Amino acid sequence: FPDLSPRADDERKPAPLTRAASLQAALGTFEKHMQDEGFSLNTVKAFASDIRLLGRYLGIGTPIGEIGTKNLTDFLHWLTDERGVPCSPKSYARRVTALKVFFGWLHDTGVLAQDPSTAVVQQSVSSPLPSAPTAVDLERALVVAEARRAGADGHKPDARPTLLLNLLLQTGIKKGEAMAIVPNHIDASDASAPMLYIRYANPRLRYKERKLPLEPEWLRVLDEYMQQYRPSDTLFTCTARNLEYVLRDIAEAGDLPVGALSFENLRWASAMRDWRAGVEQDDIRQKLGLSKIAWRETKSKLQKLIDHEATTMA
């Protein structure tokens, strides 16, 4: 390692932000803050773009301490009525969120005595509620999968439907994460408490890596699957589309509604199971691999799904 003198080391450290810092200088520090906090890559890019747009309106060299609530309100009015570029309700809502996160961070870290974004009104944007299979749907699906596993009706025994369905319900992982699993990501050293490690090759996505518990019975299904398919690389030897077909076939055989089983729907079903079981909300967030920003909307939708389910069952 190079022998850096204290002076040389100090020169490498960015100067602390003050209220006199420019919007551009604050944005650079804000981007690093978002990365350190585990914001998703898309969120970092979107929020940075939104703050640059504010800089385009106010002037990128504007001192952050001179930006008030009226400046932000005027900026939002410019976005919707004067800029000449369409601003959808969803984009508008995200930009308001970007302002609140940016100036809230400046206030929380003591750079600004007051948060000018506090009084900015966040307009709600209605987005469709996701669908998730009901408990009855899942029971039917699991019965079908177990029948396939046992080789019922003269079919060749196939453990893959049971393996896939239970994997998604127990972990809530995404399709891409499922496709990236290799057998050594599964820790079966303690058969009573097996674990799945979700890995990412991209260093910028390492914050999404996590360890997820699996039920012991799943290991027995895994053993059958490994004997039947003998994967040489990734756990699933087929394409993602083929796995989607597996889920679709289970749904059809179980007489479930069209589209009831998908990677996305089962991810919601997994989160709902944890929510009903009283799992801590931050534990659910981490299980799903979501940033704190992304969790806000997901949490709201989960609550609505649970409420809708309760109303339907009443």
Where do the PLM segments sit?
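Short, basic (Lys/Arg/His-rich) helix/loop patches that form interaction surfaces
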Residues: A150-G151, S232, R248-Q286, L290, ...
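Alpha-helix N-cap/helix-start motif at helix boundaries, enriched for small hydrophobics
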Residues: V44, L99, L164-L165, G172, ...
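Basic, Lys/Arg- and aromatic-enriched nucleic-acid-binding interface segment
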Residues: L142-K175
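N-terminal core-binding DNA-recognition domain of tyrosine recombinases/integrases
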Residues: E11-R12, G28-N42, A48-L129, A150
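Conserved tyrosine-mediated DNA breakage-rejoining catalytic core shared by Y-recombinases
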Residues: A180-W218
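Active-site/catalytic core of tyrosine-dependent DNA strand-transfer enzymes
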Residues: P213-V258, S270
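DNA breakage-rejoining catalytic core of tyrosine-based enzymes
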Residues: L112, S126-V144, L205-P216, P231
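A short, glycine-centered helix-capping/turn motif at helix boundaries
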Residues: G110, L167-A180, A277-V279, L288
